[in-house]
């Protein structure tokens, strides 16, 4: 069984506190985009086997797809195994939920193969044990995600808007970015209410004005290339530009495909991983 595993971007990301166990409390608007990995799963007699077209992708318990399969088989006492083939298109360590969406897609395919009556809500319970972005990736679309990612409120879908996406030639550790964030020194927070209103009105310019990611407080200081990419996007006609998640991917939001194509061509001269895509 074959399925697409779609990436996500953040239209906003706010950190509003920190729990005693070290987890940060988040308030973020998440958006599915039409950039995806392909996941194919076949039922086998035993074990979990991961195949991938990229050598650098782990094929053991470090892979979230492996973890998803393990949790599913254990939870439902399934006495068989799966072979999972991953065709990677989403950049890794990029703030695009590449591993999380693969894990979510594994859960959905395994439901179809083994336990078709399981609800999405039940899948989200398993998903939260894998990672904070995985529950959102079960359904995707446009949603307000709160807590550590487990509180998901769907909003009007902000679909079919043009993006150019740049993944610089380095990765970032989500853990390191959050560890270097000083919550008490976040002085400007996203206006999430205004952003949701702009999305519901499909007001692209207002969405662009209200996009904000507080993790840029950490990354823009350390990685000057991210400032340069954001500036280049605006110079090349983007309505707004922001880092997605914990980075380092940066996207520009466009209202014109010709401008987006010119921007894409320009960015391709500097960066290897550049994509034109849309919100879905």
Swiss-Prot record:
Binding site for ATP: 91-101
Keywords assigned by UniProt, alphabetized: ATP-binding, Isoprene biosynthesis, Kinase, Nucleotide-binding, Transferase
InterPro entries named in the record: GHMP_kinase_C_dom, GHMP_kinase_C_sf, GHMP_kinase_N_dom, IspE, Ribosomal_Su5_D2-typ_SF, Ribsml_uS5_D2-typ_fold_subgr
Enzyme class: transferase
Residues the record marks as active site: 8, 133
Biological process annotations from GO: isopentenyl diphosphate biosynthetic process, methylerythritol 4-phosphate pathway; terpenoid biosynthetic process
Disulfide bonds, paired cysteine numbers: none
EC number(s) per entry: 2.7.1.148
Pathway stated in the Swiss-Prot or TrEMBL entry: Isoprenoid biosynthesis; isopentenyl diphosphate biosynthesis via DXP pathway; isopentenyl diphosphate from 1-deoxy-D-xylulose 5-phosphate: step 3/6
Catalytic activity: 4-CDP-2-C-methyl-D-erythritol + ATP = 4-CDP-2-C-methyl-D-erythritol 2-phosphate + ADP + H(+)
Family indicated by similarity: Belongs to the GHMP kinase family. IspE subfamily.
UniProt function note: Catalyzes the phosphorylation of the position 2 hydroxy group of 4-diphosphocytidyl-2C-methyl-D-erythritol.
The protein's name in its UniProt record: 4-diphosphocytidyl-2-C-methyl-D-erythritol kinase
Organism (species): Clostridium botulinum (strain Hall / ATCC 3502 / NCTC 13319 / Type A)
Highest classification ranks of the organism: Bacteria, Bacillati, Bacillota, Clostridia, Eubacteriales
């Amino acid at each position: 069984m074959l399925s697409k595993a779609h990436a996500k971007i953040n239209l906003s990301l706010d950190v509003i506190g920190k729990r005693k166990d070290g987890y940060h409390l988040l308030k973020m608007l998440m958006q599915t985009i039409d950039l995806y990995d392909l996941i194919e799963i076949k039922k086998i007699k035993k074990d979990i086997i991961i195949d991938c077209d990229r050598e650098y992708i782990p094929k053991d318990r470090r892979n979230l797809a492996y973890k998803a399969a393990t949790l599913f088989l254990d939870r439902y006492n399934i006495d068989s195994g799966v072979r999972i083939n991953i065709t990677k298109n989403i950049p890794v360590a990029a703030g695009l939920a590449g591993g999380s969406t693969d894990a979510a897609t594994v859960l959905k395919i395994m439901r179809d193969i083994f336990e078709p009556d399981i609800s999405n809500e039940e899948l989200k319970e398993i998903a939260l044990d894998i990672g904070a972005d995985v529950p959102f990736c079960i359904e995707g679309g446009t949603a307000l995600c709160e807590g550590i990612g487990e509180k998901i409120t769907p909003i009007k879908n902000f679909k079919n808007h043009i993006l150019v996406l740049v993944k610089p030639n380095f990765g970032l550790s989500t853990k390191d970015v959050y560890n270097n964030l000083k919550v008490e020194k976040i002085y400007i927070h996203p206006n999430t209410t205004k952003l949701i209103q702009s999305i519901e009105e499909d007001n692209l310019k207002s969405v662009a004005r209200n996009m904000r990611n507080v993790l840029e407080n950490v990354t823009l200081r350390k990685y000057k290339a991210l400032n340069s990419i954001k500036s280049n996007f605006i110079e090349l006609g983007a309505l707004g530009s922001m880092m997605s998640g914990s980075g380092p991917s940066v996207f520009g939001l466009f209202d014109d495909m010709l401008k987006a194509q010119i921007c894409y061509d320009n960015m391709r001269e500097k960066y290897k991983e550049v994509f034109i895509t849309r919100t879905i």
